[in-house]
C-alpha cells in the first residue's frame, strides 16, 4: 500500500510495540522519528520493521517534527499516529475501505477516544476529538505550531470524517498525566507570544475558573464520574499554566524589544 504511517517517539518503549502492532494490518510503510530515546524504543521499532530516523538538532516543536518526518516519507499519502495511540480492527477496516478511492485533496479526520486511568472519557469536550491525521503531502501538511499542531485545509479540500475512533491510552497513571502536560503550557505560551498574543495577569484566575465550568458543566464532564471531575480540575490548572506561560513569554519578548528600540536611539 502506498501509505506511510509516521510515529513520533521519545522513550516510548512501554507503548511503541502495541502502537506498531495495531498499524501492521494496514500493510503500510512505518517511519519512526525518534528524539534521543535512551530506552529500547528504537530497537523495538526496528525489530518490527519500522524505519527509524533521528530528530535533527534544529527541529523543535511538534509541528516542525511532523513536517520533517513527512519530508522523509517514501509516499505522498501519510497517516500520523502517536506512540500511545492504537488503531482498532474496526478502524483498520474503515481505512482500507476508503483508501482506494481517496482523492488527493481529501483530508481524513479520525475521532479519538482518550482513556484516563483506564476510564474512557466521552465528555469534558474530549470526544469525539476528531484529528486530521491522514492526507496527501502534496496537498497539505501540518502547520509549524510548537504544540497543538493541526493540518490546515487549503481551498478546495474535502474532509472525510471516519466513524470508528482511534484509541488514545495517554494517561494510564497520575504521573503520566502531569509528565505529558508538563511541557505543553510552556510551548503553547511561547508559540502564542511569538505570534503577538498577550494576556493580563489578573485575567488568569477567571480564565481557569471558566474552563472548569465549561469542562465539568457545559461539556457534561460530570457524566464521566470521578474521572470527569478529576480531569476538569486538572484542566483548570492546565489552563492557568498556559496563560501564565503566555504572560511571562510576552513580557520577555516585549522587554527584549524595548531594549532593542532603546539601543537604536
Set out the residue ranges of the language-model regions:
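Short, conserved structural micro-motifs that define repeat-unit consensus positions
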Residues: 1-2, 9-13, 61-66
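Acidic helix N-cap motif at the loop->helix transition within catalytic regions
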Residues: 17, 39-48, 90-91
Amino acid at each position: 500500500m502506498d501509505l506511510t504511517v509516521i510515529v513520533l517517539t521519545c522513550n516510548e518503549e512501554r507503548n511503541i510495540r502495541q502502537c506498531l502492532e495495531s498499524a501492521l494490518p494496514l500493510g503500510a510503510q512505518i517511519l519512526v522519528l525518534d528524539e534521543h530515546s535512551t530506552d529500547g524504543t528504537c530497537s523495538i521499532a526496528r525489530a518490527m520493521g519500522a524505519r527509524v530516523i533521528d530528530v535533527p538538532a534544529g527541529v523543535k516543536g511538534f509541528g516542525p517534527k511532523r513536517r520533517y518526518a513527512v519530508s522523509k516519507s517514501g509516499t505522498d499519502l501519510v497517516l500520523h499516529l502517536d506512540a500511545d495511540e492504537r488503531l482498532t480492527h474496526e478502524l483498520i477496516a474503515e481505512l482500507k475501505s476508503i483508501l482506494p478511492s481517496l482523492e488527493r485533496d481529501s483530508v481524513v479526520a479520525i475521532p479519538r477516544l482518550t482513556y484516563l486511568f483506564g476510564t474512557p472519557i466521552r465528555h469534558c469536550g474530549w470526544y469525539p476529538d476528531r484529528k486530521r491525521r491522514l492526507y496527501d503531502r502534496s496537498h497539505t501538511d501540518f502547520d509549524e505550531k510548537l504544540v497543538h499542531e493541526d493540518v490546515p485545509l487549503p481551498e478546495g479540500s474535502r474532509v472525510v470524517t471516519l466513524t470508528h475512533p482511534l484509541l488514545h491510552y495517554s494517561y494510564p497513571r497520575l504521573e503520566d498525566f502531569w509528565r505529558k502536560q508538563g511541557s505543553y503550557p510552556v510551548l503553547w505560551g511561547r508559540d502564542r507570544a511569538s505570534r503577538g498574543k498577550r494576556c493580563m495577569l489578573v485575567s488568569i484566575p477567571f480564565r481557569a475558573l471558566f474552563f472548569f465550568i465549561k469542562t465539568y458543566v457545559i461539556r457534561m464532564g460530570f457524566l464521566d464520574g470521578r474521572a470527569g471531575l478529576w480531569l476538569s480540575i486538572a484542566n483548570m490548572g492546565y489552563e492557568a499554566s498556559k496563560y501564565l506561560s503566555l504572560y511571562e513569554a510576552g513580557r520577555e519578548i516585549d522587554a527584549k524589544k524595548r531594549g532593542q528600540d532603546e539601543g537604536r536611539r
